[in-house]
Amino acid sequence: VMPLKSEDYYRLTQSGLNGVVCFQETYHKDRYKVYHPKGMKSIFEWRVNGFDRMGQAGVHKIGMGVLIGLEDWRTDVTMMAIHLQYLRKHYWQTRYSVNFPRMRPSEGHFQPNVIMTDKELAQLIFAFRIFDHDVDISVSTRENAKFRDHIATLGATSISAGSKTDPGGYATYPQALEQFSVSDERTPAEVEQAVKAMGYEVVWKDWDKIFDR
């Protein structure tokens, strides 16, 4: 779902919405238009200001992210850090999460403009953990199982499992419109066992609306 109006987010929160994840993808305004030439998604300001609208509507948790591979990743993640700092100042009751998905082979065969190594991704996660001790750091199934298992002990707080990358993928089959390839194909149960083997407790849900009363 593309970024909505504040009143739409508010209605959704009143209906039980807990969190919203919206990837800015890149903070490079001119290049953003190259990647998104048409429709509402092409309006840079509408997308980047969508996080304010979420905060104004009282969304409990806001997820942010840039797509590593589009533009210089150091610039993009620095801009996201500044954006996160701004949001924390203005919507301090909201929780935040960040994600740094690296581009993988896709249906459109779009090749990354920038390559980030495993060491660089780990360095970035460490830097964000130092920058913001409380932010949730998510690592998606774009990354391989070995990397995810190791980084879960070194700064990441959330790892996905059983992900579908095609539009409507959780409701339709087969994956006819897959947007990118999944590297870690373990089932949720298998990921759960891996986390437990590390000595950690698996938490599937960490919030409920009743806690805000």
Where are these regions (language model features)?
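Auxiliary Fe-S-binding modules of radical SAM enzymes
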Residues: 89-213
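Aromatic/hydrophobic pocket-lining residues that form the small-molecule binding cavity
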Residues: 44-47, 77-80, 121, 188
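Catalytic cores of alpha/beta
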Residues: 5-14, 60, 71-85, 144-155
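Conserved strand-turn element in the central/C-terminal portion of the radical SAM core barrel
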Residues: 4, 37, 50-76, 99-114, ...
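Conserved SAM/AdoMet-binding glycine-rich loop
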Residues: 1-51, 56-57, 61, 70-72, ...
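Residue-level "edge-of-site" marker
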Residues: 2-3, 25, 67-68, 141, ...
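Conserved, mostly hydrophobic/aromatic
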Residues: 22, 54, 84, 128, ...
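Short hydrophobic alpha-helical runs that function as membrane-insertion/retention elements
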Residues: 21, 62, 158-162
